[in-house]
Structures are given as C-alpha cells and as structure tokens.
Amino acid sequence: MPSNMKQFCKISVWLQQHDPDLLEIINNLCMLGNLSAAKYKHGVTFIYPKQAKIRDEIKKHAYSNDPSQAIKTLESLILPFYIPTPAEFTGEIGSYTGVKLEVEKTEANKVILKNGEAVLVPAADFKPFPDRRLAVWIMESGSMPLEGPPYKRKKEGGGNDPPVPKHISPYTPRTRIAIEVEKAFDDCMRQNWCSVNNPYLAKSVSLLSFLSLNHPTEFIKVLPLIDFDPLVTFYLLLEPYKTHGDDFLIPETILFGPTGWNGTDLYQSAMLEFKKFFTQITRQTFMDIADSATKEVDVPICYSDPETVHSYTNHVRTEILHHNAVNKVTTPNLVVQAYNELEQTNTIRHYGPIFPESTINALRFWKKLWQDEQRFVIHGLHRTLMDQPTYETSEFAEIVRNLRFSRPGNNYINELNITSPAMYGDKHTTGDIAPNDRFAMLVAFINSTDFLYTAIPEEKVGGNETQTSSLTDLVPTRLHSFLNHNLSKLKILNRAQQTVRNILSNDCLNQLKHYVKHTGKNEILKILQE
C-alpha cells in the first residue's frame, strides 16, 4: 500500500511527508493554525525554503532563549492568499509579516521577487482537496523579505473601516490622554505596525517613571499590577473611561495639576526601561513600610518571592479544574472564592501577605477580579489584532469600544462577563456569548497567567507552562486567541525600538524634562538638545 498522500487536506500533512523536523518546529512555536485556510478569508500559501541554510537558521533561533526571529522568518513564508500559479502572483499581496511582495518577473512556472530576490516555483507534488484553498511553493534561492513597505489589500464590497472613536463624554484629563494615545497608535500601526514607536509603551513607561521619581509609595502600590503588554498596563493604571466612583488606582491629584504627571513623556529607551520595571519586582530594597494594623514590617511576597506566589496560584488552579464537579455552577463560584480570599486576607491558600497593603486596599470590592478579567479579554483582542496579516482600524476600534462602553470600571461586579457566577445561572439568558463558549473562556482564563495575576520578573517568562485540565480541549478554535502566553506578549513588546543618546542619567533627564514641560524654561531644553 502507498504510504504517501497524493492529495492534501492540510499543508501540515504535506510537511509531515517532506520535512517533519520543520513541521515540529512550527508546531512547537504554536504556528500550525497559521497554515490553516480556515484562518484566512482568501486561503493560504506556504513558501517552503529549499535552502538548508534557511531551515537551519529557523531551527537555531526556534530553540534559543528568544524564538522571535524564527517566528518572524516563518511568518515571511506564509501568504494569507490562495496563489496556485504564477498568473495569480499579481496585485497587492504580501506575507503574514505585513510586508508587500514586489514581483520582478513571472514565467510559465516561476516567480522572481524583487525584494529578497526569491525564486519561487509551485510544488509539483502538492495537490489540495478540491474544496481547500491551499498552495505550496518551493523557494529555490534567495529569501523572503522581512522588512519593507506594507501592503494593503482592498476590501470587498467597498466602504471604509469604522473609525476609532475620538469623542466621549465626560471629557476628562484621563480621557484626553487616552484618546491622544489611541490616535497615535492607529496612525503608527497604519505606517509600520508601530515598529519604531509604540505610543502605549511610551506613555506606560513615562507614567511609571514619574511615579518612581516623585511618588515612590504609589510606585510600590502599582508595580505588582503592571503587565508585559503595555496596552494593558496603560489602561489598568490610567483608567481613562471610569466615570463613577473615586476609587481610581492612581489619584487625580498625583496625575494632574502643577506638580502632576500630565501625560509628559519621560523616557530615554522605552523598551529597556519597561523591562527594567519587571526586574525591580524582585529587587526592591525600600519595602520597609509597616503594616497599619500590626505596626510590623512585612515584605510582600510578590516582591520577596514571586515564584512561590505563582506556585500557590498553580495549586489553586489545579484544585479548581480537578474538582470533582467542574461545571457552570461550581467552577465560577470557586474562582470567586479564590479572589475573595485574596481581597479580604491578602493571601493565596492562606499564604501571604501577597501584595503591599496599599495595593490590596486598592483592589477590594471585586476590583482585582475585574482587573484580571480585563487583562484576559484585552490580551485576546490585542493578540488577534497583532496576528492579522494587515492592520485594520476596525479591529482596534473594537478594543477601544470594549474599554469605553463594556468595561470602563464603573461597576466592577456588573462588568464581569466571564467569571461572574450570575452569568451561568438558569435565569440568565442575556448576553452575546453562548453559555458553552463563555464557560470555555472561563476555563481558558483559569489556565492563563491572568488568573490571580501578579507581575512576574522578565527572566521567569517562558518557564514551565501552566498545568491544564482536559476541559481545555473544549475551547473552540476561535477562542484560542484568548489564551495568554507571555512570550507572545514579549514579541509584541519587542516591536518597539525607542532609543536616544544618553547624556545624563535617565532619572536626571526625566526630572529635567518634566520641569521644562511645566515651567516653560526653554533654555534648559536647548541645553538638553545640544
């Protein structure tokens, strides 16, 4: 009996026959879904690198401490279009990286690209099932471009993307900063995927730098809550669309006014400084603030031993998912119990204190659970946005609308959409998520690092994976984008490369810039620019 397929339902089946090692790498990098035609409206084409040198480079980077280069190279080999013959290699096409492919020459059975000078021929032995829009090409020489002008596919049916909302009432100093950042992000994503400057990263670093320099007790309070995704950090710290209540994480008097932050940019190398904040989680030397009740000094465990915190969190996670009654009634109640213990006693499984007293006081009355569900949802939406082959304003607008109208932070318990037991009651029939899908998302949330979140030092990212329950097999494919992987968040973060020449120390420069911004002392600014 023949052992090889003659027709293929998947590109991965063809790879299994031709290069199982490369298929294993793609699978280990969680990129198999990128080869599925179901992911793309226009089918998918895979460029197989015939050159052993390219495949060896992919392997070397894939199994290194930073697999981002392997991911980027593989993305350059995936085209979100069905291109079966050279005749279809026309118009606005590009790779999954978003880089436009410029064709220099097409022949009867060959395509030569300008950028990268790749020579491509259709794979003679790849024949997809008739209903599958799949194609495989062989790259005989050259390479696929990793950088270059972006491509923009025309939309079918006409019309423009809904714009990112730019107006909201009431219009506060917090919303003003958020709207400015959202507009800047939309603009730079259209230009270069924010590869040069990420506005969310810049503002998050600037706010944290301001707190570190001017309000160290506030800095200590918020540091355990920061997230590797600067977009998430920005919204959780600023809370720009909250209109009810005065329980802001950072008070108005600190953010605004003559001595406030006021949105000032305070950074020299945003990405490096942002990562540095995570290393401070285990290197705090000024945690000598006595507990207000006992008058004793307790160094919060989120600072002194974050690994143990995550170990106890894993115990809670395992207990919930391996409980003898994992269902839509028991499971959400167990999640709420875990958060109630943390909010009321500052412990996880009676181990604590987890957070500084000021932090836990700011997270009571459902705010901690609301924050972590917020992380989970925004991570998923942001990851979906960044995984698209082309940037669409409508996708980003959906994130903004979710933050403004569904999760502004006005009523924490009522804004819980996944974790609230009320969502699974017999009488609860409203909402736009089917009960099984909602429960699958709850299981994914429990399995994510967003569950009972505490910021983890950068050197710990990419460690042991969370133990999962067999229930995760129930998660529909379209919901896998909600799973939170720190490495993918770091990949988004590493798109930003913001550096300037350091003349003075970062702290000194930041203090001077803030002084100039709010006093108009332009002579000092001239000196800094020399």
From Swiss-Prot:
Keyword S-adenosyl-L-methionine attributed: no
One cellular component (GO) term of this entry: virion component
Induction of the gene: Expressed in the late phase of the viral replicative cycle.
Disulphide linkage map: none
Sites annotated Cleavage: G158, G159, G463, N464
UniProt keyword list: Disulfide bond, Host cytoplasm, Late protein, Ubl conjugation, Virion
Coiled-coil ranges (or none): none
Keyword Ubl conjugation in record: yes
Family statement: Belongs to the asfivirus polyprotein pp62 family.
Name of the protein described by the UniProt record: Polyprotein pp62
Species, as recorded: African swine fever virus (isolate Tick/South Africa/Pretoriuskop Pr4/1996) (ASFV)
